[in-house]
């Protein structure tokens, strides 16, 4: 699904995990497609959602706010949110906002799955 300059693709990994690959720009305008992707990723009961941000070009404060909104939803539903593929720039932003304390940040999908015990 493409919206503006953001593209999301949902991919099941296992019965307990799914990935959402995000490419392009994440802004507040990305909320509907990202939340729809999350709903599709968890529809079959996945407890771990991995955001693949390797194709992220740009994220503004609205995009950071959207990650917070997603994180609250994930935690409320008893799931875990992880992220992979972050550039050094976006790793630093997540550290400055302390989102890295709530979102598991890993280099690869395999590392994220291992950290989740899958």
Locations of regions flagged by a protein language model:
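A short, charged, amphipathic alpha-helix used as a generic interaction element across diverse proteins
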Residues: 112-118
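Short beta-strand/loop segment at the start of cytosolic alpha/beta domains
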Residues: 1-21
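Conserved catalytic submotifs in the C-terminal HATPase_c
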Residues: 14-15, 54, 110
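Residues at or immediately preceding the N-termini of alpha-helices
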Residues: 31, 109-110
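Short acidic-hydrophobic, aromatic-tinged amphipathic segments that line or gate anion-handling sites
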Residues: 104-108
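Long, contiguous secondary-structure blocks with strong helical propensity
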Residues: 16-17, 80-81, 85, 117
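Amphipathic alpha-helical interaction surfaces in cytosolic regulatory modules
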Residues: 25-103
């Amino acid at each position: 699904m493409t919206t503006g300059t953001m593209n999301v693709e949902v991919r099941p990994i296992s019965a307990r995990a799914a990935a959402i690959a995000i490419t392009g720009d994440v802004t507040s305008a990305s909320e509907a497609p990202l939340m729809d992707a999350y709903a599709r990723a968890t529809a079959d009961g996945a407890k771990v959602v991995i955001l693949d941000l390797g194709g992220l070009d740009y994220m503004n404060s609205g995009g950071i706010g959207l990650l917070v909104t997603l994180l609250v939803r994930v935690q409320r539903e008893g799931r875990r949110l992880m992220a992979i593929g972050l550039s050094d720039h976006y790793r630093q932003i997540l550290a400055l906002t302390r989102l890295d304390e709530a979102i598991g940040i890993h280099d690869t999908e395999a590392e994220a799955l291992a950290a989740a015990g899958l």
